[in-house]
Swiss-Prot record:
Source species of the chain: Shewanella sediminis (strain HAW-EB3)
Subunit annotation: Homodecamer; pentamer of dimers.
Gene3D superfamilies membership: Phosphoenolpyruvate-binding domains
Keyword Transferase: yes
Location of the protein in the cell: Cytoplasm
Broadest EC class assigned to this enzyme: transferase
Predominant location category: cytoplasm
Involved pathway(s): Cofactor biosynthesis; (R)-pantothenate biosynthesis; (R)-pantoate from 3-methyl-2-oxobutanoate: step 1/2
Designated name of the protein: 3-methyl-2-oxobutanoate hydroxymethyltransferase
Domain of life: Bacteria
Length: 264
């Protein structure tokens, strides 16, 4: 199979083909996800919670992400690999450049940053220097203490308009992908239709161009709180590779996410 690139995902969007993404942190799981057809793998700062046992993502370091990016890179042949920029690793454009370079050298194809208007200059500088950017709007977990918890964003008209405006500005700044997390499905649909670049949803309804989940949720091995937007595919299939295929098939057919996994 041909390698997935940002151009591939753009073509999928133009053709109306839904694509799938998962988090991954090691070579073995990454290889399984890659070979079963997951299009995008994210070395997420979610590792702070699902691997390291923290209450949030804030303790994760650039070194943590780089280590796991190298591990995942060794396990994949096809999937596009995105690495999260962890908390405060891109507070300035100079920091962003240094840390994004380290993650690209670790094997990432793209880096992901959380935030809106304040990031526009950083996004432009990274893309101008050959570092592709995936942006992240809505519930941005690194800002959990500002939000007062893991809460749905964009439910009132003012915040919905702000998120839409930020999405358009981020695209204009040069971002090649956008993740929207925990926003009302109608808002996610509006954003996906308004942008040329592909939009990946998590807890954002079925009308985004792609879907992403945390691998621990898909495999039913998360401890503690289970997000409403997640689905345990291993429970219904009994085998890891079958679970991944079921996830891919349900996204392609528009079955997942259903109303039980969506906010309005």
């Amino acid at each position: 199979m041909s390698k997935i690139t940002s151009s591939t995902l753009l073509k999928f969007k133009q053709e109306g083909k839904k694509f799938t993404a998962l988090t991954a942190y090691d070579a073995s799981f990454a290889s399984a996800f890659d070979s079963e057809g997951i299009d995008v793998l994210l070395v997420g700062d979610s590792m702070g919670m699902v691997l390291q046992g923290h209450d949030d993502t804030l303790p994760v370091t650039v070194e943590d992400i780089a280590y796991h990016t190298r591990c995942v890179r060794r396990g994949i042949k096809r999937s596009l690999l995105i690495a999260d920029m962890p908390f405060m690793s891109y507070a300035t454009s100079e920091q962003a450049m240094t840390n994004a370079t380290a993650l690209m050298q670790a094997g990432a194809n793209m880096v992901k940053l959380e935030g809106g208007h304040w990031l526009l200059d950083t996004i432009s500088k990274l893309t101008e220097r050959g570092i592709p950017v995936c942006a992240h709007l809505g519930l941005t977990p690194q800002s959990v203490h500002v939000f007062g918890g893991f809460k749905v964003q964009g439910r009132d008209s003012d915040n919905a308009q702000r998120i839409l405006d930020e999405a358009k500005a981020i695209e204009a700044a040069g971002a090649q992908l956008l993740v929207v997390e925990c926003i009302p499905a109608p808002l996610a649909k509006t954003i996906s239709e308004a942008l040329t670049i592909p939009v990946i949803g998590i807890g954002a309804g079925a009308d985004t161009d792609g879907q992403i989940l945390v691998m621990h949720d898909v495999l039913g091995i998360s401890s503690g709180y289970i997000p409403r937007f997640s689905k345990n595919y291993l429970k219904q299939t009994g085998e890891i590779r079958e679970a991944i295929r079921a996830y891919i098939d349900e996204v392609a057919q528009g079955i997942f996410p259903g109303s039980d996994h969506t906010f309005n």
